[in-house]
From Swiss-Prot:
It is found in: Cell membrane. Signal peptide: none annotated. GO terms for biological process: ubiquinone biosynthetic process. It comes from Pseudomonas putida (strain ATCC 700007 / DSM 6899 / JCM 31910 / BCRC 17059 / LMG 24140 / F1). Its EC number is 1.14.99.60. The gene is coq7. The keyword Metal-binding applies. GO terms for molecular function: 3-demethoxyubiquinol 3-hydroxylase activity; metal ion binding. This is 3-demethoxyubiquinol 3-hydroxylase. Fe cation 2 binds at residues 94, 146, 178, 181.
Amino acid sequence: MATERHYSPLDRLLLQADTAMRTLLPFSGQPARPSPAIVQPDVDLDEQQARHIAGLMRINHTGEVCAQALYQGQALTAKLPEVRKAMEHAAEEEVDHLAWCEQRIRQLNSHPSVLNPLFYGMSFGIGALAGLVSDKVSLGFVAATEHQVCKHLDEHLEQLPHEDEKSRAILEQMRIDEEQHAESALEAGGYRFPAPVRFGMSLLAKVMTKSTYRI
């Protein structure tokens, strides 16, 4: 039977640095799951439509950068091994979302947000602090964050042009995955944050969405 490898604190820091670089640099590999957009038809979009869709996908890409950082920060400070594993598994699934969003952004002749390093650092710190408080709070933060992401995805799905089936397929699959992450976190014992905390999180999310839509 294979034994589980135990990493030293230095090993974990180096792994975190590697993950940060792979998250923030242009994606060059292949996601574990192919993009849902692959099977959808190409359609002609006018310049205004393409620019708006690219802005929405840029927001979603930055949201996935934040989620990746949040999970990595929590995994670094999680107290229970099973919680750390859950965070790392969720982070792996977010890599697919990162790749899908970036691929779609490039197809629209645009680029990811230049603010991604800033939001990665902020989210990593928040995740690490949540993990230091308790695993229950850490898991609750995951659930609250993912529910906020689902809300944004619903709004973006309503804004997409009907003919853009590629972006729609990506966002619909992302929403399924994010909802599952939220429910899994609560089932694992995550704390249900009160309304004032969720409201504060929504204000922070608005700062991210407003700033990354264009840059």
